[in-house]
Amino acid sequence: MIRRVKREIRVIGFDDGTFPHKKRGEKVILVGIVMKGGSDVLGAVSRWITIDGLDVTEAIIDSILSSRFRGDLRVILLKGITYAGFNVVDVNRVFRETGLPLIVVVRKRPDFEAIENALRKHFEDWEKRMELIKAGGKIYELIPGKVYYQAIGIDAETAAKIIRATSRNSLIPEALRIAHIVASAVMRGESSKE
């Protein structure tokens, strides 16, 4: 339990690389950036995950539990709940198995109706994926129209404080911003815009 949010809180933020011209079943990189607050990068982890697969949950859990940073981490930051297309994170399982609370940060409020329609159209197991997406719980608005978040294993107020404490050069936590830069550079040869 996080009683007080310190500016130097140790977080790990995950994002995947862009994947133009790749097809379902191919691999994309998932990068986790370990930071002290919003200023110091302490390290990084990476795993390959399957486009539209169901392996991102295991990748996140494994990258944390096998990391030398494991004992220092206090929070997991996710840039959305889906990676590599519709490879959906089971946020409750990640919380149970790592013991770390999660904060899911997004720039646009999710349109669950559009997501469900896309899942129905392309996946036989659409109900399972939709259930995992909704398991993130209530969506909170941090900056009206610009930043939204979900809090798993942590209260919403503390989660908001952590987002603010770890954001420096953008509206989202620095660990997520850097994870995006690194992951997109690995996949494209150059980083892409958020």
UniProtKB/Swiss-Prot annotation:
Any single Pfam family the record assigns to this protein: DUF99
Coiled coil segments of this chain: none
Name the record gives this protein: UPF0215 protein PF2042
InterPro entries for this protein: Endo_dU (IPR002802)
Family: Belongs to the UPF0215 family.
Gene3D superfamilies registered for this protein in UniProt: archaeoglobus fulgidus dsm 4304 superfamily
NCBIfam families tied to this protein: PRK00766.1
